[in-house]
A protein has these predicted regions:
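Structured catalytic core of nucleotide-sugar glycosyltransferases
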Residues: 1-146
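A transmembrane-helix-recognition feature enriched in membrane-embedded lipid enzymes
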Residues: 146-152
Length: 152
């Protein structure tokens, strides 16, 4: 993680939106939901994020039942939100739609296959609280790829 701090530390607990673009993720969705829910609840318990924080799943016109899973889960859990695109527009458009719909202090994006280390979300929040405006991570290897990412 590269660091350039130009601001003072923050005193207010930030709200967080985790934006997750999804396309045909019916198999990965339950694992993604479980992992991100654990992270969100952990951050809430440590009082690192505000109670109005949430996970936003953006369905990019999936042809499987990804949207149905998102919709059902969002009706059961108040910290889950869903956004459905009318058709497949591509990962970047789904990501942009999610970022545009996030209404929080901090927004983190992550792919539904959890190929990136979700444990870094807490470190990113810590950096934000130290005063950083932009925090991003770069993987230096692919040894942590999930089984979904490695599948042919």
């Amino acid at each position: 993680m590269k660091e350039i701090n130009i601001n003072n530390a923050r005193s207010q607990i930030p709200s967080l939106a985790i934006v997750v673009p999804c396309y045909n993720e019916k198999d990965a969705f339950p694992y993604c939901l479980e992992g991100l829910t654990t992270i969100l609840k952990n951050l809430l318990a440590k009082e690192k994020i505000a109670r109005n924080s949430y996970i936003l799943f953006v369905d990019d016109g999936s042809k499987d039942n990804t949207w149905e899973q998102i919709k059902s889960t969002s009706q059961e859990k108040s910290f889950i939100r869903g956004l459905k695109l009318s058709r497949n527009r591509g990962h970047q458009i789904a990501l942009l739609a999610g970022l545009a719909n996030a209404d929080t202090d901090v927004t983190v994006s992550i792919d539904a296959d959890l190929q990136d280390d979700i444990g870094c979300i807490e470190k990113m929040i810590d950096k934000y609280n130290e005063g950083f405006e932009i925090v991003y991570g770069v993987r230096d290897n692919r040894s942590s790829d999930s089984v979904f990412r490695l599948a042919p």
